[in-house]
């Protein structure tokens, strides 16, 4: 809240407040996994240490009220007996002699520290907002945010200086993935949480095309594009969709469809499904879109600038 107020948020009313004590009791565990990750000798050990940190967030956010018990039955009498219970929440019959009955639990043990997940999200947002508002927007007057994800930003930066000289040695960045011959290479922050890494390792980006949330394509100076399209098979995204297709969809207001094949299962029986699915679309009902030549700007509905368009 203090950060939001410093950034200009107007607080009109406080409905209720919580008082609590804070301490970095989780820090030794996070630091341990960070050291294990940095000292890992193979990709598996590195990913395992990373998972131990990331999965902690998910485990603290679990809703234990949704836990169920599954009973496997092989005779009709047992199935009927369980189905008559008040805590029965459903059942699935696999064949004439096998069924699974879903039961709600009699006792729910509220043993998950839900506040931990809330605190992790809050601290993460504080770091992200601090970087965007207090560094990027102050350092580059004409910076434009292209998209953001949970822990990443994509910017269009206009500057008269050499951008790589600007950011060299900056406390916000981790340059450990740069080539060793690059002037900015520095592995002192390698795999340490809390720093921003250049996803293209010092390679300039030629073009960015954003269609909708989680549907964009980035074309670097060299190498293959990085593209996302939510709900689209990886094979279609990497092999069938080109960066030019994203541009054609945006400027030509054209929708693309592709045939996709996936493996599905029902009652533990596997089968393949072929479907024709929309892969690219420039239409979005979640944002107000303005256009100035080849430049598009989106605003959330209710934004004060919309009335001036």
Describe the role of every protein-language-model region:
Residues 1-309:
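Conserved acidic
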